[in-house]
Amino acid sequence: MRSVIWFIVSYTLMLLVLRGGKEVEAEKLCTTIGDLDGKCSQDGEKLCMRYMTDQSKKKFLSCTCNNVVMLHKYKHYCECQSHCTPKQT
């Protein structure tokens, strides 16, 4: 008797799991780029996040900091990801 009940319960749960799954489209991410004077430090990503947030007034999910040389000077090259906002017409 117990095995029959367990079979019915497990079968019902399996059906719910298989039929209940919906496909969700991933939200697109947009990239924003900026640069600062100097080299990236240990907390370069945090510095980029603060700088880019202050400049664009957007909330960023993640930022990377890369050192580049422009006109014989080091620069922070900040590349930050945020959710894309729909264009308003």
Curated annotation (Swiss-Prot):
Leader peptide range in chain numbering: 1-26
Domain of life: Eukaryota
Biological process annotations from GO: defense response to fungus; killing of cells of another organism; signal transduction
InterPro entries found in the cross-reference section: SCRL
GO cellular component entries: extracellular region
Subcellular localization(s) per the UniProt record: Secreted
Main location (coarse class): secreted
PANTHER family documented for this protein: DEFENSIN-LIKE PROTEIN 241-RELATED (PTHR34450:SF6), DEFENSIN-LIKE PROTEIN 245-RELATED (PTHR34450)
Family membership noted in the UniProt record: Belongs to the DEFL family.
Name listed for the protein in its UniProt record: Putative defensin-like protein 230
Protein's organism: Arabidopsis thaliana (Mouse-ear cress)
UniProt gene name: SCRL24
